[in-house]
Amino acid sequence: MSTLTRSPAWLALSAHQTEIANRPLRTLFDEDPQRFDKFSLQFKDLLLDYSKQPVDATTIRLLLALAEQQKLVDWLGRMANGEKINFTESRAALHIALRANSPVFMDGVDVTQEVRRVLRQIEQFVQKIHNQSHRGYSGLPITDVVNIGIGGSDLGPVMVTEALKPYHLPQLRTHFVSNLDGAHLSDTLQHINPATTLFVIASKTFTTQETLANAHSARKWFLAGGGSKQDIAAHFVAVSTNREAVSQFGIDPDNMFEFWDWVGGRYSLWSAIGLPIALAVGMEHFHSLLAGAQAMDDHFLTAPFEQNLPVILGLIGIWQINFFHITSQAILPYDQSMHRFPAYLQQLEMESNGKRVTRNGEAVDYSTGIIIWGEPGTNGQHAFYQLLHQGTQKFTADFLAPCRCHHPLSEHHPMLLANFFAQTEALMRGKTEQEVRSELANQNLSADLVEHLLPHRVFPGNHATTSILFKKLDPATLGMLIALYEHKVFVQSVIWEINPFDQWGVELGKQLAGKILAELALDKPVTGHDASTNGLINFYRAQQ
């Protein structure tokens, strides 16, 4: 057993789980009519309801004791004070500085000065695009923005841009290209004009294979479509830390928007990586997005843990993953504009906490991270909810929804939210054999048919969910939501004693792909891999 799993706080939670696991959720609600009031929290217009989780007052007390044992307070301070807590890369993790309204220091230097400088650069550029003083090579204004990036240079910006569609400025269309599959770029290029298109090449190192392949193809298309090399300056900008590589590509370094090595990719949408967001919705709304995140930062760093939304959300996840052995979490936004939110959280959670060794390099003997997936409601109800209600796989789920909608079809929203509320209740309560029998008896069915149908109509229930409601999905609220999950991930990493800010797991496949790419051009059978990989490569080559 590791130090963590034999610690007093961990052992106390293990013993408590044995007891509370025998108390179904519907029983917990039946026993305590005030359960919602006791196990829900509100911050500004954001409501977090965790009363449908298998917790009682003892659970929360023991989880908070675990947080104290793991020195969560100290780690919050270390992050906020710019310590190099990403120790495998010798970097700080200061994404909170990107939205801070007061100085944040690293190595004695207030990094927010540089943040503000780049924000001013972004604002000036966005203004030129919007007022059409920045024009394409033919003199026409820019009508389309194509962001080329992958991972953190794509998932955050595309998620936010989609979520804030009601705030889009009408004169610009925003597109995102990430996949190395040429179809992604090719399909996008079919709908735009080289003379009125701006490409944003987003890569921290400016060496990412997928991004550079797409960027070079986009440049080739641009030059073939009437633009010259001199015109690239008006149509290509870069978001990067590598000025030399940007210049070698042909982009004017003055058109490079900088960010810093203390900004992790999956935490970078608040930085210059968010340029396409600012272009889509304008700087006022981009600043509101930052302000919402900053408000959640302040709450996270100052609120008592028992009233702290990210802390409670993170600890509930620990409770489910490590003591109920849940490996799957559905993210279910009942808002179509949030359709990319599950994919965004996949990277945030799985790339951050998908680690197998502690900060000290010791193999863990407990689960870390969870498989994140999801789909907007009510689409998911007609796809995978069957398994959630009557299947055999264990899971937990977060339901998210706005109380008010942006679109004019307002009569749809009560129906949507009725489904939201119904699903969380149905997953929790289920339907007992007695309830099904009574229901069938009222349908004038024969006794034999009732017995035949009975087992198929029973819902076991007792499925844990967390609900997050908010007034309306505006930029500030979205900023709060994203920061809520960012900090939740950090809380869990502290409990698990892992580094959530590196991602060495993405490297091995990239290294092998480089070797295999050269082999695909050989004129002889490939034999240097295992039999399966050799067979796959040789089959591919035979089809060319």
UniProtKB/Swiss-Prot annotation:
* Gene3D superfamilies with a match to the protein in the record: 1.10.1390.10, Glucose-6-phosphate isomerase like protein, domain 1
Q: CDD domains in the record, alphabetically?
A: SIS_PGI_1, SIS_PGI_2
What's one GO MF term for it?
A: glucose-6-phosphate isomerase activity
The residues annotated as the active site are 351, 382, 510
* Key word Isomerase present: yes
- Catalytic reaction list: alpha-D-glucose 6-phosphate = beta-D-fructose 6-phosphate
The Gene Ontology CC terms held by the record are: cytosol
Q: Which biological processes are named by the entry's GO terms?
A: gluconeogenesis; glucose 6-phosphate metabolic process; glycolytic process
A Pfam family: PGI
Name the EC number(s). Answer: 5.3.1.9
Q: Which UniProt keywords apply?
A: Cytoplasm, Gluconeogenesis, Glycolysis, Isomerase
Q: What is its main location?
A: cytoplasm
Pathway recorded for this protein: Carbohydrate biosynthesis; gluconeogenesis; Carbohydrate degradation; glycolysis; D-glyceraldehyde 3-phosphate and glycerone phosphate from D-glucose: step 2/4
Q: Does the keyword Metal-binding apply?
A: no
Compartment(s) = Cytoplasm
What InterPro entries does the record tag this protein with?
A: G6P_Isomerase, G6P_Isomerase_C, Phosphoglucose_isomerase_CS, SIS_dom_sf, SIS_PGI_1, SIS_PGI_2
* Matches recorded under PANTHER family: GLUCOSE-6-PHOSPHATE ISOMERASE (PTHR11469:SF1)
> Main role?
Catalyzes the reversible isomerization of glucose-6-phosphate to fructose-6-phosphate.
Q: Which family does it belong to?
A: Belongs to the GPI family.
The name of this protein is: Glucose-6-phosphate isomerase
Q: Which organism is it from?
A: Nitrosomonas europaea (strain ATCC 19718 / CIP 103999 / KCTC 2705 / NBRC 14298)
